[in-house]
Every structure is written in structure tokens, then in C-alpha cells.
A protein has these predicted regions:
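Positively charged, small/polar-rich N-terminal and surface patches that mediate targeting and assembly
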Residues: 1-112
């Protein structure tokens, strides 16, 4: 089992969600986050004063999936999130030691 985490542009969330649903991902967790990488920040004008916005709004998507689904999940996220411009995001894949469905007590792949 793996936890696939992606940091993407907020306006690409619907496309990514649809792509993941299309390959059978049954649930995701979405968190609004801020960060910067190569994209860096930008300068804004507020009440006549310029200031630098260092952290840009992003969306973090997390999906716990079976090992055999990981490559398809990565492809779905890439296709849904890609604009071809700096700041499209990153995908991280982590091993999951254990998963437990609290309601039923199911564990492992059955809990996904």
C-alpha cells in the first residue's frame, strides 16, 4: 500500500479529481496549502505599498492506494495537473505500514 501525495495548482483540482475517479480511486483528502519552489513568489500592490508574496496557494491531494494502482494514479495526477508551466507541482509516494478503517476495524488493503 502507498500514500500518493501531490501538490498542485488549485484551479487544476477538479481535473485531477475526475482523472482519479476515472481510474477507480474511491477517496482522496484535499488540503489547502501554501509553498514555493522554482516558481518563487511575486510582487503585489496593496494600498499603494508593494510587498512580496513568498508563499503561493497550492492544493495538497492525498490518496492511499494499492501498490498495483500507483503508476496509474501518478499518470492521472500528471495528466490532470499539467499546464506545462513552472509551478505545476510535485508528486510524492510513501510506503504505508498499516491502514485501519475505524468504523469496521478492517485493516490493510481491505481498509482502502
Amino acid at each position: 500500500m502507498k500514500l500518493v501525495t501531490a501538490i498542485i495548482k488549485p484551479f487544476k483540482l477538479d481535473e485531477v479529481r475526475e482523472a482519479l475517479s476515472g481510474i477507480g480511486v474511491q477517496g482522496i483528502t484535499v488540503t489547502e496549502v501554501k509553498g514555493f519552489g522554482r516558481q518563487k513568489g511575486h510582487t503585489e500592490l496593496y494600498r499603494g505599498a508593494e510587498y512580496v508574496v513568498d508563499f503561493l496557494p497550492k492544493v495538497k491531494i492525498e490518496a492511499a492506494v494499492a501498490d498495483e494502482l500507483v503508476d496509474r494514479v501518478i499518470e492521472a495526477i500528471e495528466s490532470g495537473a499539467r499546464t506545462g508551466k513552472i509551478g505545476d507541482g510535485k508528486i510524492f509516494v510513501y510506503d504505508l505500514q498499516q491502514v485501519v478503517r475505524i468504523r469496521t476495524g478492517e485493516t490493510g488493503a481491505e481498509a482502502l
